[in-house]
A protein has these predicted regions:
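Class II aminoacyl-tRNA synthetase catalytic cores and aaRS-like
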Residues: 1-342
């Protein structure tokens, strides 16, 4: 299987479970000079990203206008905007930028899609997204936010034009299945509301030895990589796992890095810390989602189609008509009581 780090997955696909049946995103930041950014009202230090949906065919002016409107609606108040590259050609100031964008798409995608000239490129839908001046400060605490947003748009348009590019159709060949391992997930994630770092996976996942030695557990939590991994197929996570911490000193340091005192750690996990003192071999594993694997094998589009007693969107089991009211006697037997919220 292909192997890709979490950071590469986000920077290239905008998601931690890439669907590699479609080409990756392209970063056009180096093509936009400060002068061009100023003229186009684009933030100076934020990435400009583009992607291509293959074999959509040439769109009419009306169709393209409607598509740009749909893209802007999807982006909402994010501060991101669609750059209409077709209008750049008519301006002597921006025509070189349009040519640079076209050439970079050609360079990045020619081997993937099999076209070798800009004329063939016209059959493919090109989308370029720019951060407008004053893009929300959310960027300040999530440096990957723009990549994730553009990645979500990429998938949305891929679904919209699925009947055109046909990349999601089953051909009965090995090419239908794009497996990969995504590795090196973040050890911590930032909670903006609580202003604290939390364990992204769980606090028993082992961090990279290099990050431990560099002191990043206390000095730079956002850069700490976990020995965590997912196996992905066609944009679906089939399983997730990690290498566990097997050293007491590392486990204690992780608890401290999450704001837990040594006393609290021993009160809650003393049994585990004591066990680690006697020596534990390196160990890890993975949990596979059997229901998702069955869904793919069955060619189903939803987990509900392969689960024996699926729930509705309102969490109702239509087979047994659950949930149903519980009698007072049943509640009493279980020492439970119901509380009605105002």
């Amino acid at each position: 299987f292909v192997r890709m780090t979490y950071d590469d997955a986000i920077l290239k696909y905008g998601i931690d479970k890439p669907d590699m049946r479609l080409p990756a995103m392209v970063n056009f930041s180096s093509e936009l000079t400060p002068e061009l950014r100023e003229a186009l009202k684009i933030e100076q230090n934020l990435p400009v990203l583009g992607f291509l949906i293959p074999n959509v065919g040439e769109l009419s002016g009306t169709q393209r206008k409607a598509l740009i409107s749909q893209v802007r609606s999807f982006l909402g108040e994010s501060g991101l905007d669609a750059l209409d590259t077709t209008r750049l050609k008519s301006s002597s100031q921006f025509a070189p930028l349009e040519d640079a964008i076209s050439q970079k798409f050609l360079l990045e995608y020619s081997s993937f899609l099999g076209f070798a000239s800009p004329a063939e490129e016209d059959e493919h839908l090109v989308i370029v997204i720019t951060p407008k001046l004053g893009t929300p400060a959310k960027w300040n605490f999530d440096s990957q936010w723009i990549y994730k947003r553009v990645g979500a748009l990429r998938l949305e348009l891929a679904k919209k034009f699925a009947d055109k590019h046909k990349r999601f159709e089953q051909t009965g060949t090995e090419a239908d299945y794009k497996f990969l391992w995504v590795t090196d997930f973040p050890m911590y994630e930032w909670d903006e509301e609580a202003k604290v770092w939390n364990a992204a996976h769980h606090p028993f996942t082992s961090p990279h030895e290099e990050d431990i030695k560099a002191g990043r557990l206390t000095s730079d939590k956002g850069a700490v990589r976990a020995l965590a991994y997912d196996v992905v197929l066609n944009g679906t996570e089939l399983g997730s796992g990690s290498i566990r911490i097997h050293r007491q000193d590392v486990q204690a340091e992780i608890f401290r890095s999450l704001g837990m005192s040594d006393e609290e750690a021993h009160e809650r996990f003393g049994f585990f810390l004591d066990a680690l003192e006697y020596g534990t071999p390196p160990h890890g594993g993975i949990a596979l989602g059997l229901d998702r694997i069955v869904m793919i094998l069955a060619g189903a589009s939803s987990l509900r189609e392969v689960i024996a007693f699926p729930k509705t969107a309102k969490a109702i089991d239509l087979m047994v008509d659950a949930p149903t009211p519980v009698s007072d006697q049943q509640l009493k037997e279980l020492s439970l009581r119901t509380v009605v919220r105002n």
